[in-house]
Regions:
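His/Met- and acidic-residue-enriched segments that coordinate or traffic transition-metal cofactors
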Residues: 21, 25
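Short, helix-capping/interhelical loops that line the mouth of catalytic, cofactor-
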Residues: 1-7, 51-120, 149-169
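Individual transmembrane alpha-helices with interfacial aromatic-anchor signatures
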Residues: 118-133
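A glycine-rich, coil/turn loop motif that links secondary-structure elements
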Residues: 33-42, 116
Length: 169
């Protein structure tokens, strides 16, 4: 794998930090915002993000069965029961969750073949392509929701580094 396990965990934790930074920019009045009727609202997107990453990591590690809809329904139902603050707390917990889930995973485990959603891959490739890239994609979606709701001051620094842009001099 191109990334070390430590780099993978660090990258996933960085995604959590950026997501929480962006979530801190949400005005509660925009929680029901959705770009089109069939897209997730801001709160629904956050609720999905509160379980997507860790559940996919568990799937890659064989801790949940790929074809078991009960697993996804249980985590989805738990997420649906959360309010905004509880959802953010669940997301914040991912920092430790990722470290714990991947603690005993070896480089050999990451190179092991795995049946992903699109066919055979390695566990490491699945974790990078689906979990890490998925986190980046969905936080970008949240960023776009924020921009659409008038948060014009947000910049690429918010999106990619999870920080506010320096004040203009």
């Amino acid at each position: 794998m191109v990334l070390t396990k430590s780099e993978l965990v660090s990258s996933l934790q960085h995604e959590v930090r950026i997501l929480l930074h962006l979530a801190s920019k949400i005005d509660r009045a925009m929680l029901d915002y959705r770009p089109t009727p069939k897209q997730r609202s801001t709160l629904e997107l956050l609720k999905y993000l509160s379980y997507m990453g860790p559940t996919l990591v568990k799937l890659a590690l064989g801790k949940v069965e790929r074809g078991d809809p009960g697993v996804w329904m249980a985590v989805r139902d738990a997420a649906e029961a959360r309010d905004f603050d509880e959802t953010l707390a669940a997301i914040a917990a991912h920092t430790e969750t990722y470290a714990t889930l991947l603690a005993d995973v070896s480089d050999e485990d990451l190179r092991a073949e795995f049946e992903g959603f699109s066919g055979k891959t390695t566990r490491g490739a699945f974790l990078v392509n689906l979990v890490l890239c998925g986190c980046a994609a969905y936080r970008t979606q949240l960023f776009l929701y924020l921009k659409a709701c008038g948060r014009e001051e947000l910049t690429t620094a918010n999106l990619w580094r999870g920080v506010d842009a320096p004040a203009a001099v």
